[in-house]
Amino acid sequence: MFIPQMIQKGGGGVINVGSTASFLPVPFASVYSASKAFVLMFSDAIRYEYQDKNIQVMTLCPGGTASKFSEVASEKSSDALKTLNQVLKEKGQLGDSCELVAREGLDAFLKNKSSFITGKGNKKFAFLPRILSRDRIIKLTGDIFRKRVAK
């Protein structure tokens, strides 16, 4: 981490990249969604720990993004990531460009946001846990992914 150097310089900032999967359990992509949830919680914790040192920490949570990730996930990654990529393509969630995600993320960071969900329609993923039970969310996401894994 670069925290010690930031403290020496009187402050700094970190943008960690989470995902809309940070907010939901995603069966058949469990390691991916769990790791992105970790990024969100870790960032929240270190933001609090270093707030008095003038260090800003934000978690950027994009949805599907049109990037090389989709190609790499299709060619070299686990079945779970291939499945996640396929679902995002089918749902039309790979439409946001990397440039748009970066621009929205930097704008949010400059406004001192603690986290930011990029793209149109992606905020709904963060709100689902507020209106649906965990069991219902797991069933919904599991049913979507199960169909792809079975292929």
Ranges and model annotations:
Residues 1-10:
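A short helix-coil junction within the Rossmann-fold of NAD(P)-dependent oxidoreductases
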Residues 112-144:
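A transmembrane-helix-recognition feature enriched in membrane-embedded lipid enzymes
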